[in-house]
Amino acid sequence: MAKAKFERTKPHVNIGTIGHVDHGKTTTTAAITKVLADTYPELNEAFAFDSIDKAPEEKERGITINISHVEYQTEKRHYAHVDAPGHADYIKNMITGAAQMDGAILVVAATDGPMPQTREHVLLARQVGVPYILVALNKCDMVEDEEIIELVEMEVRELLAEQDYDEEAPIVHISALKALEGDEKWGKQILELMQACDDNIPDPVRETDKPFLMPIEDIFTITGRGTVVTGRVERGTLNVNDDVDIIGIKEKSTSTTVTGIEMFRKLLDSAEAGDNCGLLLRGIKREDVERGQVIVKPGAYTPHTEFEGSVYVLSKDEGGRHTPFFDNYRPQFYFRTTDVTGVVKLPEGTEMVMPGDNVDMSVTLIQPVAMDEGLRFAIREGSRTVGAGRVTKIIK
């Protein structure tokens, strides 16, 4: 029986709804699925509002996040859409990366205009690297006065510009509720919103197009053949006989050639992002490499020891710390496959960090780790996860 193959006929884009509580994020999500299911029944099924709103809990690195996933298609694209109903859920999702977003729909109620969480979500989207935001101005059926709508639009554009987002981004007037009720005029506006997503959210750069990178999980010696390292390819593609560097953890990097690639006990000519495989390395002894190092295309990545990160600290209920931590806190930072101890410097004016907080911090690691902006990590004390974060800036 052949496995059902994932059809790669259309570009796949991850998208999400962001915005202030009660401005209609979930209703907008439901309206999109309904209108697309009505318009392109052969491509889509509708998801009921309550199935989206009762978001299942997800465990991402031990942090409980309520998040719902729906998928839908336009004629041009296949979208996977995440909706995090609660504000805390949204923040946790953004920082821990339970769902990566290639673009976001910022939902703003025309009746309220931008509110504190609207601003906070846009700031977070910038910090975690969401590349594009467009706007759904919701509840437009409730505002008679055109001037009010124009004022709200101006405020939203200023907000986007503050965070270096496209000030000229489309702002589509919608009424998610009316569209859900089957109103034809407002249904058309949802289609316009999706057209704006198709036209303005850039096609994502897929992991396979980036330079090769594979974190080492395990190391074996095969008598008579040499050393094999195993792991999951994070980025790029690799062919047999390619040269690679082994970097991170140790002072010096090592160069070698991949003489064989094995997957599910079969020999392959190449490996690509997403594959779990073993690489046979020429002239490398078992003690030359260790878990936590990464195998990379020569010169494509560099190891670093100092960075700034945006971190969510687990609350006591989530299994995190029971007490705050202070400047010079020294936990382990778990990157990809290994822990490295680091020293935390808190931002000026922050005396301490409480469980349940999110904070921006600077970290100095005692060993170098191959990283770039956007890389995620967990913060651990022994085997217990106490926080999750992502690299926002490399210092050294």
Curated annotation (Swiss-Prot):
Positions of region (G1): 19-26
Main enzyme class: hydrolase
Domain spans labelled tr-type G: 10-205
Segments for region (G2): 62-66
InterPro entries recorded: EF-Tu_GTP-bd, EF-Tu_GTPase, EFTu-like_2, EFTU_2, G_TR_CS, P-loop_NTPase, Small_GTP-bd, T_Tr_GTP-bd_dom
Subcellular compartments: Cytoplasm
Keyword Magnesium: yes
Region ranges (G3): 83-86
Family (UniProt): Belongs to the TRAFAC class translation factor GTPase superfamily. Classic translation factor GTPase family. EF-Tu/EF-1A subfamily.
Name listed for the protein in its UniProt record: Elongation factor Tu
Gene it is expressed from: tuf
